[in-house]
């Protein structure tokens, strides 16, 4: 009798353990946080999964996944090529993709276009193509994007002219859409923008018809020969992000979009037709002021 009862409990315990193991799901770690799912397939470029008790199968780029914790206890880690981009200085970190699955679920930042043309019919085709690509990355970075999905590419080789016909130098154009994996914490950004004063340190500008982006020091000193500080007149939250206005920034645009904000630096952006401009604003916590304190301004 005692053996029968013991066998019953052992059987029930085994069944419960099996059921628990069966009910446990996989955990997929995405850019926006972990999700409990059932992983169906880990392919070369994509991962297919479904949600518990659902039949719909979803597909996502492996670039958007940092890790999978399988129900079995095994873990698989992925190295994403997506890197942080806070403005023009990080333009080389912009990831170029030709695969639409790479940008599913990412935050769109705007349409892009870049063009580069050789100076003469002896210009290097590769050099011109690389310059067009750098301009594409630069424009994306100035929109606060770190991923570009290329839509169209046009490339023309050098065309040598004749006695009655002018030649054409090589040209490359790219068009695409900018995306970001980095989402601005709206409440945190608004609080920080309202609580601090800033100095307009640099201005970065890109004209699509120009050779490359321009960088200019914008520092203005007050009557005591100290960098001029200012506060924002308004901080506004909209559907697509946070906007600010400040009379101390030399722009005719009433509202500038915030593309990056931390304790040391804020980058705000305006875009007019073919020209995009970033205003680099720094706070008292920036290392620039620490270095300034160690020297004397004449």
Report the location of each language-model feature.
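Bacterial Sec-dependent N-terminal signal peptides
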Residues: 1-24
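Serine/threonine-rich low-complexity intrinsically disordered regions
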Residues: 2, 23, 87, 99, ...
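Residues at the start of alpha-helices and the adjacent loop-to-helix junctions
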Residues: 6-8, 13, 29, 132, ...
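Compositionally biased alpha-helical segments
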Residues: 21-123, 127-142, 170, 247-298
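Extracytoplasmic low-complexity/disordered linkers and repeat tracts associated with LysM-containing
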Residues: 85-89, 97, 101-105, 186-193, ...
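A short, hydrophobic beta-strand-centered structural micro-motif
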Residues: 135-156
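Surface-exposed short loop/turn segments
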Residues: 152-194, 203-223, 229, 240-290
């Amino acid at each position: 009798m005692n053996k029968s009862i013991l066998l019953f409990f052992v059987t029930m315990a085994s069944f419960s353990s099996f059921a628990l193991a069966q009910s446990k799901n996989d955990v997929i770690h995405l850019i926006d946080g972990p999700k409990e799912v059932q992983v169906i397939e880990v392919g070369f470029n994509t991962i297919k999964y479904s949600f518990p008790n659902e039949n719909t199968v979803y597909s996502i780029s492996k670039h958007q996944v940092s890790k999978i914790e399988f129900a079995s206890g095994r873990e698989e880690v992925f190295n994403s090529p997506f890197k942080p981009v806070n403005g023009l200085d990080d333009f080389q970190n912009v990831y170029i993709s030709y695969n639409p699955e790479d940008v599913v679920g990412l935050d769109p930042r705007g349409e892009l276009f870049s063009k580069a043309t050789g100076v003469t019919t002896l210009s290097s085709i590769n050099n011109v193509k690389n310059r067009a690509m750098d301009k594409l990355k630069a424009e994306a970075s100035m929109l606060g994007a770190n991923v570009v999905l290329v839509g169209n590419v046009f490339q023309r080789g050098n065309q040598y002219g004749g006695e009655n016909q002018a030649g054409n130098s090589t040209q490359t154009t790219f068009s695409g859409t900018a995306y970001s994996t980095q989402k601005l914490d709206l409440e945190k950004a608004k609080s920080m923008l309202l609580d601090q004063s800033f100095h307009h340190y640099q201005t970065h500008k890109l004209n699509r018809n120009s050779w490359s982006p321009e960088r200019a020091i914008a520092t203005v000193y007050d009557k005591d020969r100290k960098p001029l500080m200012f506060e924002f007149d308004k901080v506004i939250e909209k559907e697509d992000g946070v906007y600010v206005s400040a009379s101390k920034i030399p722009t005719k645009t009433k509202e500038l979009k915030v593309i990056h904000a931390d304790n040391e630096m804020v980058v705000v952006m305006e875009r007019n037709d073919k020209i995009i401009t970033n205003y680099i604003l720094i706070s008292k916590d920036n290392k620039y002021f620490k270095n300034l304190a160690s020297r004397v301004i004449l």
